[in-house]
Amino acid sequence: MSKFSPPINRNMVELDRSFFHKEVPLLAAYFPNPKFLGQFVKSCQNDILYVQTVKHIISMDDSKAILLRDDVKSISDLNPETQLKINEFGIILKPYTLKLDYSFWKSEEILKSILPENLIDDVPSGFSQAGHLAHINLRDEYKPFGKLIGQVILDKNPSVLTVVDKVNTIANKFRTFPLELLAGEPNYIVEQSESGCKFKFDFSKVYWNSRLSTEHERIIGKFNSGDVVGDVFGGVGPFAIPASKKNVIVLANDLNPESYKYLQENIKINKVEPFIKPFNLDGREFIRKAPELLLQWHNSQNGIIEKKIIKKVSIDDNKTKKNFERKPIIETTKIPKFYHHFVMNLPDSALTFLDEFIGLYGSNPQLKTDPEFKLPIIHVHCFEKFENNENPTPEELHNRVYEKICKLIQFPLNKEKMEFHEVRMVSPTKPMFCVSFELPEEVAFKQSK
């Protein structure tokens, strides 16, 4: 065990910070003349104490000293060059006691010193964070020690004010879980920044996953200004709001009334009202009504979104010096009557909603005569879980998902034109994919019998 390891108490029930106190005996190189400090540090790196958060240069007896490696007991333990410098600079070796307390050790080190020995190999010190709230997923064997773990995480992360754990792993239809407060304030209303936008929501009542921020940005990067996007399971707006900031026209939907409430609030916070319409519908109903909802929006705005922006305008023709003033300008964006993209971020069940796209435009066959018409790209998230005794290749997993999609939309897609993106591994046997494909004309315009 290192001299710098924390003291051990595996019987601790409530966190006792005062227990974490340790004194480490060291030797310090005392400089009667501190002008030699810089030269010594440069020449004697291998004999200087370098330990996390410990300053190796200290004040001592109206001058300065440098802490030496913790295994140095006398001058003979030092490198020959260091011994020469000690004599050359008139350095005196003096004993020094380094005092360590609770603040010195990282959360993982503290937890390894207080949890049962059979649990220290995989200490749960990591977490995902939304605003001031840290969310950990404790395995069953760690749950009896949840309060201890939560308090240490709270102490060691200044931006965290609340630490929670899932009571169980069975989500309701809104993808939310009952939470247990482990430490800190019982305040679940958080403010989170992502993709240049601000989001406010009640973490206990809506779905939010900070680990998906890269995926949000990846999908948003596929949208162009003026595109129309249907966000089927939009939550509080992690896709919709950043997209609408780049003048993407978004119809955002979520079944959860709380998500819908905060989606509306986040639209106002981010001032993207002209480009986004929120809905509180079942996903199937939203897909079914999507063309009608878009047409209603188009007609209510005479096919145009107007956005007031402030622009610098030149007011002087002088070529050597130009003067500008800020003027309000009305920027216009045409509202198409068709969708460019649909986002389906509900990996547990999004695939099962794909059959609703059959006949999406079936009642409006003349739509494809629009010279600007494009078929929508579907971005559907899904899990493709496999057994522990399996070792499928990515290609095999892609094929499994491909077959499911073709069966659901009742059409043999060209697999070569589809994109299979692995978002993350939720567990060793549970990859999450996002599959992107163009909805075939034969499917989109299929007539209902």
Swiss-Prot record:
Pfam families: TRM5-TYW2_MTfase (PF02475), TYW2_N_2 (PF25133)
Intrachain disulfide bonds: none
Enzyme's top EC category: transferase
UniProt keyword Iron-sulfur, yes or no: no
Reaction catalysed by this enzyme: guanosine(37) in tRNA + S-adenosyl-L-methionine = N(1)-methylguanosine(37) in tRNA + S-adenosyl-L-homocysteine + H(+)
EC number: 2.1.1.228
Compartments, as annotated in UniProt: Mitochondrion matrix; Nucleus; Cytoplasm
Keywords: Cytoplasm, Methyltransferase, Mitochondrion, Nucleus, S-adenosyl-L-methionine, Transferase, tRNA processing
GO molecular function: tRNA (guanine(37)-N1)-methyltransferase activity; tRNA methyltransferase activity
Binding, S-adenosyl-L-methionine: 216, 254-255, 282-283, 345
Any GO BP annotation: mitochondrial tRNA methylation
GO CC, one annotated term: nucleus
Binding partners and assembly: Monomer.
PANTHER family for the chain: TRNA (GUANINE(37)-N1)-METHYLTRANSFERASE (PTHR23245:SF36), TRNA METHYLTRANSFERASE (PTHR23245)
Function: Specifically methylates the N1 position of guanosine-37 in various cytoplasmic and mitochondrial tRNAs. Methylation is not dependent on the nature of the nucleoside 5' of the target nucleoside. This is the first step in the biosynthesis of wybutosine (yW), a modified base adjacent to the anticodon of tRNAs and required for accurate decoding.
Family: Belongs to the class I-like SAM-binding methyltransferase superfamily. TRM5/TYW2 family.
Protein's name in the database: tRNA (guanine(37)-N(1))-methyltransferase
Protein source organism: Candida albicans (strain SC5314 / ATCC MYA-2876)
Lineage: Eukaryota, Fungi, Dikarya, Ascomycota, Saccharomycotina
